[in-house]
A protein has these predicted regions:
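Extended, folded cores of ATP/NTP-driven motor/assembly subunits in large transport
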Residues: 1-259
């Protein structure tokens, strides 16, 4: 609905693996969250620029005999992730601190019973009302965690694979993509880290078959974060020379067409 003139077409699968290069020239890995998933990455609402331009620049470095692919796969996650976010904010506020020993807790209760007859009611009420004073950084984190939990969450797998004459060249191509993803890094919150995989045959197989393991619930992004990573290229933000665009548009036919006459 955000792109009413967009048209989807089914195409043949692109083969990014060079026919002349061997498996030794393949490199790849995954981009995972650098911190716990409750912390959000930097989105378009904060950066105010289109991050897809840097990704397109990274892919423009690929030569004719080389190949590189970026897979972004996601699926709805269990709504329980919002409870984890709520628990994290409570911990930051200091509301869920538990004693490390039941014996210490019993001693504290006994001390309270002994002091109670000699302690003025005002002093007791004052001690109960004492709350943790949050720092500016803690307030920012609490607000960011709550804001992320407002939107639907998705388990995400981001895989990048490159094929060239040598592994060093493939890693250099991947380095451009990793650098482009640094735009989503937030100093005090979250970002992405690149995890290189050593099994080259497994990298190629997982990429071809789009393998999405079940244990990827540590990488959870909401709909705003996903839209920041991938969206249809904006004509105003992305130069026309970098993206192949349609020269014609398909329009719907008239509703009432005469059947005779």
């Amino acid at each position: 609905s955000a792109y009413p003139t967009a048209r989807l077409e089914e195409i043949f699968e692109d083969n990014i693996f060079s026919k002349t290069s061997e498996i030794t020239g393949v490199a790849g890995g995954e981009l995972a969250l650098s911190r716990e998933f409750v912390y959000p990455i930097a989105t378009y609402e904060e950066t105010k620029w289109d991050a897809s331009g840097a990704l397109i620049n990274a892919f423009s470095m690929v030569k004719n005999h080389e190949g590189m692919g970026l897979q972004l796969m996601f699926r709805p996650t269990d709504p329980i992730w919002t409870k984890v976010s709520s628990e994290r904010t409570q911990n930051l506020k200091g509301g869920n601190k538990k004693s490390g020993s039941s014996g210490i807790a019993i001693v504290d209760i006994a001390k309270g019973l002994v002091r109670a007859p000699f302690e003025p009611p005002e002093a007791a009420d004052k001690s109960k009302k004492q709350e943790k004073v949050l720092t500016a950084d803690e307030q920012t984190k609490i607000q960011a965690i709550d804001e992320k939990a407002k939107y639907p969450g998705f388990e995400v797998l981001i895989r990048v694979v490159a094929s060239s004459d040598s592994e060093a060249r493939s890693e250099a191509l991947i380095g451009g993509v990793v650098s482009a993803f640094s735009q989503f890094n937030s100093t005090s919150l979250n970002g992405f880290k690149y995890e290189m995989l050593k099994d080259k045959e497994k990298i190629a197989r997982d990429f071809i078959f789009r393998l999405f393991p079940q244990n990827k619930n540590k990488n959870i992004l909401n709909s705003v974060e996903l839209a920041s990573i991938y969206h249809l290229p904006n004509r105003g933000a992305i130069p026309t020379s970098q993206v192949e665009r349609q020269t014609v548009k398909q329009v719907d036919g008239p509703v009432k067409i005469p059947k005779d006459g």
